Amino acid sequence: MLVSIVVPVYNEEENIAIFYNAVTKVMSGLSYEYELIYVDDGSTDSSVVILREIAKLDARVKVVLLARNFGHQTALTCGLDYAKGDAVITMDGDMQHPPALIPELIRLWENGYDVVRTIRDSTEDASWAKSFTSKYYYKLMNKMADVPIVEGGSDFRLMNRKSLE
């Protein structure tokens, strides 16, 4: 079975090698084939050069280049379109989403979950103003939305092929 890992990138030249090494280390301990799909969202630094070099050395790495900066969600959606895996993991390449959690996402998928999402459980790095604003944003959105929005949700998740189609 194939696991796709989709990673939007925007001016992440300092993090790309660190992230790549962390993901390959984690995935080498698992029994799945994988592809690592980087979607560059119009970076203006050396991100594209670094990504292309990694892709030359590792056939599992795919690089998708957007013509300009379309935004994080568009880059994620584009990566999902390219992903071929039986399971697809989306995560940020700046190490905010720890690759060490990938085995747990896969374990839950193996146990029958179609979608496994992560939730930030700590805002200790956030300022008082950001925490306050975030808390009331979710309260307001949940009053207006038909579907509950979970506080602390993130793009770090696993989805099976069925849930993507």
Across the structure, where does each feature detected by a protein language model lie?
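Acidic helix N-cap motif at the loop->helix transition within catalytic regions
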Residues: 14-18, 44-54
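Cell-envelope/extracellular polymer assembly enzymes that use nucleotide-activated donors
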Residues: 2-4, 35
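Short, well-formed alpha-helical segments that are part of the catalytic scaffolds
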Residues: 12-27
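Short beta-strand/loop segment that forms part of the nucleotide-sugar
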Residues: 32-42, 64-65
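Acceptor/aglycone-binding surface of glycosyltransferases and processive sugar-polymer synthases
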Residues: 53, 64-68, 72-82, 87, ...
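Short helix-capping segments at alpha-helix termini
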Residues: 27-32, 55-60
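A conserved acidic beta->alpha catalytic loop
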Residues: 40-48, 95-96
